[in-house]
Design a protein with these regions (language model features):
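Short, intrinsically disordered low-complexity segments
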Residues: 1-2, 17
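Sec-dependent N-terminal signal peptides
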Residues: 3-13
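Acidic, metal/ion-coordinating pockets
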Residues: 17-347
Length: 347
């Protein structure tokens, strides 16, 4: 009888623990370049140190996600051509680098962005192959990997990712976006949405609540789409694309990060000033995805081209910046950020 009671109590504790769920989200990840072949930018020790200083944080959540900014492909593919070469970048990473993501603790990757098609169909297939073989969840490719579902510790998670780019699930198709999220809602306990949206660069850290354009492209309205996603059934929305941090927000009890900036961009991405800020956002929700509390963990990228990686930042620069942006752009938000990075509901 004592043994039966002990087992019952153990099971009860396990299920009680899932009343609170934790999520970690970070920004753009590009771990090193194997293109062009005559001038690669690969990190020391073949990238094994990429997440060394932050992996304890990344591993400490029920679900950890990021944005894979580029393709996983060892060779080949046709590099994209741009009408304006001065703002044209192509990112191709060795397929084996997917193991660094697994080792760091990632569960989900968005492939909905403007670099997931840098090497055409060959690049997309390479990414799908590498991520699938590594057991990493991913979403955002039109027609082939539009959404992703997984069950972990008895909780069913649904993941969808959107961008404005060809080959991705495009947020411009509002009805399709809503349908995909709604379908996930029906079969998931928690629905997570990634949006690659908004203008880019150091001058694009503000949430304008308007449609944003960059190099002639309609990059969408982050404020509006986050609400569309939540109304359709999302429990949290994480933004990528601007390459700088933006404000955070709460809508109908669901958490929004409008942009998480750059996280681990080894080469070819500007990391000066706020472009080098690499915030790690950790939130806790109840079993229905309603926000309970959170934390901004400050990190910053350091190193020369080919050696860059994120380091924890004791100065709290990310915290201060996101707090400032949130107070300026979303003054009505229900969220309060204290100086240590703790995110709570306003009293």
């Amino acid at each position: 009888m004592k043994k039966i009671i002990s087992i019952f109590l153990l099971v009860s504790v396990v299920f009680a623990a899932k009343d609170t769920l934790s999520f970690v989200a970070v920004g753009d990840i590009m771990m090193g370049l194997n293109y062009p072949e005559d001038a690669p930018a690969l990190p020391p020790q073949d990238g094994k140190l990429t997440f060394a200083d932050v992996q304890d944080v990344l591993r400490n959540a029920d679900i950890t996600m990021g944005n894979l900014e580029g393709v996983l492909l060892d060779s080949g593919g046709s590099a994209k051509q741009c009408s304006n070469p001065s703002v044209c970048y192509v990112f191709r990473m060795p397929e084996r680098y997917v193991n660094h993501l697994v080792d760091a603790g990632f569960d989900l990757m968005s492939v909905a962005n403007n670099h997931s098609g840098d090497f055409g169909e060959a690049g997309r297939k390479g990414s799908v192959k590498a991520l699938t073989e590594a057991g990493l969840g991913f979403a955002g490719f039109e027609g082939t990997a539009e959404t992703y579902s997984l069950e972990k510790d008895g909780v069913r998670y649904g993941f969808a990712a959107f961008a404005p780019n060809t080959g991705t699930v495009r947020f411009h198709d509002t009805e399709k976006s809503k349908r995909l999220i709604s379908e996930l809602r029906k079969k998931s306990d928690i629905v997570i949405v990634s949006m690659h949206i908004g203008a880019e660069g150091t001058g694009s850290s503000r949430v304008t609540r308007k449609t944003e354009n960059f190099v002639g492209e309609n990059r969408g309205n982050p404020y509006e789409f986050a609400r569309i996603a939540i109304d359709a059934g999302a429990d949290m929305v994480f933004g990528h694309g601007p390459h700088v941090p933006r404000a955070i927000d709460l809508y109908k009890g669901k958490f929004i990060a409008y942009s998480l900036g750059n996280f681990a961009t080894n080469a070819s991405v500007n990391i000066s000033g706020i472009s080098g800020y690499a915030p790690i956002v950790k939130i806790k929700t109840d079993s229905k995805g309603n926000f309970l509390e959170g934390e901004i963990i400050s990190a910053i990228q350091k190193g020369e081209k080919g050696e860059r990686r994120p380091f924890l930042d004791p100065t709290g620069a990310c915290i201060e910046k996101i707090k400032q942006l949130t107070e300026a752009d979303i003054p009505e938000t229900e969220l309060f950020i204290d100086k240590s990075g703790k995110i709570t509901l306003k009293k």
